[in-house]
């Protein structure tokens, strides 16, 4: 029994050391950018570790350029800005971010990556698309007179205004707060290495950030 316990302890220690290296991050970003380029969707891509530290961000040429149509009255946006516009469910809660324009797309990509890392586990990979289905005011989304999703409202739990958020993203090693709260916008996934959860990846390419109010209309379509 002692020998078995020793082997288990050694194995656990070795497995616990699995982390994303600089080489891993570079390869992940390159593969994601290659996929986005192949789809004709310039994207901004972020990679974080298990506790929300940003390990890398890559902005492809032409990704999420500011849309003058969303500019406030009297404001001429810089056409070189890379931003997203935040939208939500008109029948759901106001997150305090709804309708904001010119939010840096890097923050959206990081929020998606953090969500993929935080909500996943060794046994369950939790994407932001999955989050979108279970955080809305009806489950399934769009089905009136049904209870809210099991994680209704969790997307605002990490915002600075949240009662659940006690510490901001300071100089510590983490856990770090997601810059836009937990994300319900498709495009965030966990990252595994040798079977261990080591972080998350997030991508944004459509200039929008919100949630899927109709989870059925995205089948067969790219939406990140």
Which residues does each predicted region cover?
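Flexible, solvent-exposed loop/hinge segments and secondary-structure transition points
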Residues: 17-223
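Sec/Tat signal peptide C-region and signal peptidase I cleavage site
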Residues: 12-16
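Bacterial N-terminal signal peptides
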Residues: 1-11
């Amino acid at each position: 029994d002692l020998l078995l316990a020793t082997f288990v302890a050694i194995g656990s220690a070795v497995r616990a050391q699995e982390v994303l290296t600089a080489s891993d991050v570079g390869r992940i970003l390159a593969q994601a950018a290659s996929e986005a380029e192949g789809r004709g969707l310039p994207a901004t891509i972020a990679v974080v570790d298990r506790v929300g530290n940003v390990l890398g961000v890559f902005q492809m040429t032409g990704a999420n350029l500011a849309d003058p149509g969303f500019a406030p009255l009297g404001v001429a946006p810089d056409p070189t800005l890379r931003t997203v516009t935040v939208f939500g469910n008109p029948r759901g809660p106001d997150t305090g971010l709804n309708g904001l324009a010119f939010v840096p797309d890097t923050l959206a990509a990081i929020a998606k990556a953090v969500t993929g890392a935080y909500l996943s586990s060794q046994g369950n990979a939790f994407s932001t698309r999955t989050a979108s289905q279970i955080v809305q005011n009806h489950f399934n989304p769009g089905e009136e007179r049904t209870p809210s999703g099991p994680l209704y409202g969790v997307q605002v739990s990490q915002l600075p205004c949240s009662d659940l958020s006690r510490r901001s993203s300071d100089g510590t090693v983490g856990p770090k707060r997601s810059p836009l709260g937990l994300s319900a916008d498709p495009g965030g996934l966990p990252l595994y290495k040798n079977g261990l959860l080591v972080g998350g990846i997030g991508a944004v390419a459509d200039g929008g950030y919100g949630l899927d109010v109709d989870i059925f209309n995205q089948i067969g379509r790219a939406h990140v």
